[in-house]
Amino acid sequence: METEQDEVAQDELGPEIALDKDPFQLTVEDVYDISHIVGQDLLKISREARGVSSLVSDLQFKIVRVLEMLEALVNQSSLSAEELKMERDNLKAEVERLLKDGPQMGVGPDKMVIDLTDPNRPRFTLQELRDVLQERNKLKVKLLVAQDELQCYKSGIIPSPDDQIVTLENESMITCSPRENESKEKSTVKSLFSFKQGKQT
């Protein structure tokens, strides 16, 4: 509505209003109005001074060239302004669409979003970590027991296992070695890391 009132006011004031405008507010029509004003002034000069008509015509060509450049600049800036407005409108529509879709895709209060590119992201569940810690504690206990047994063997409190092997051979007793049982049974740590390595490849 305001633009229509501005156009009516501009028509009432004539083309001279274009010269008073801010250069960044000029339109192509304003450039045509300026061209009309300059052309009228050049005509007046050429009519009054008959001897300077060749100078006026040279000046007229230069002014026409400047006005053509001004027109090109105004066209380019108005296109840029329109492109920016279109881009703004597109972005507004995109934001509105995302806001509408946002609650559907939103994360609940007991959920967490994980950035897969973050090197410090959590990789295991709490239960897996608990299992690993329990396994580690069991292995520590076994290590302490083995170190104690080794210390006992070294000090001579427990007879060496070579003596026990000889007596077992004499009795011809067949037993399954504990190492075979251990190899059949994968530890939680090994299975966890083998699962993780399988995922990465």
Curated annotation (Swiss-Prot):
CDD domains: RILP-like
Biased segments, Basic and acidic residues type: 179-188
Domain of life: Eukaryota
Claim: Lyase is one of the keywords in the record: no
One Gene Ontology MF term: protein dimerization activity
Record region (Disordered): 177-201
Keyword Protein transport belongs to the record: yes
GO BP field: epithelial cell morphogenesis; protein transport from ciliary membrane to plasma membrane
Domain spans labelled RH2: 121-197
Subcellular location: Cytoplasm, Cytosol; Cytoplasm, Cytoskeleton, Microtubule organizing center, Centrosome; Cell projection, Cilium
Keywords of the record: Cell projection, Cilium, Coiled coil, Cytoplasm, Cytoskeleton, Protein transport, Transport
Functional description taken from the UniProt entry: Involved in cell shape and neuronal morphogenesis, positively regulating the establishment and maintenance of dendritic spines. Plays a role in cellular protein transport.
Recorded family membership: Belongs to the RILPL family.
Protein name from the UniProt record: RILP-like protein 2
Underlying gene: rilpl2
